[in-house]
Amino acid sequence: MKCVVVDMRNRLFGDAISGSLQHFDVGFRVYQTEGTAAEDLCVDTHADVLVAEVTAYPPWRLEQRLDLCRRLRQGLPGCRVALVVDEVCEPQLADQVRRAKKDGLIDGFFYSSVSSDYLSAMIDAL
């Protein structure tokens, strides 16, 4: 069973992602957190995947998320990091996230407009 930590600024969106993952047919153990607690929760649960929202506001800024990804790769090398960004409201940020994936700084990314089934399947494949 894959352990997934969900760290979203928008609690409603986080609940929707968590619910979708929990109902996915392969099964996930899903934990939700916010901001600076994400790293501790990933370590405590031996997370396989961190799904984290990126916004223009701290502590969800891209630079902070990339720092978190670096720390997780050092302390929990098996944990994959996938970022979620709103490509409609934040097109420049979405482009920066896409480049971070191309540069190997993160393991994956999703636009907030993707379906919950697609998101679940891609997280399972990470």
Describe every region a protein language model picked out.
Residues R11-G35:
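Two-component/phosphorelay signaling modules centered on CheY-like receiver
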Residues D86-A125:
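Output/docking surface of receiver
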Residues L50, V81, G108-F109:
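Two-component signal transduction core modules
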Residues D7-M8:
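Conserved acidic carboxylate
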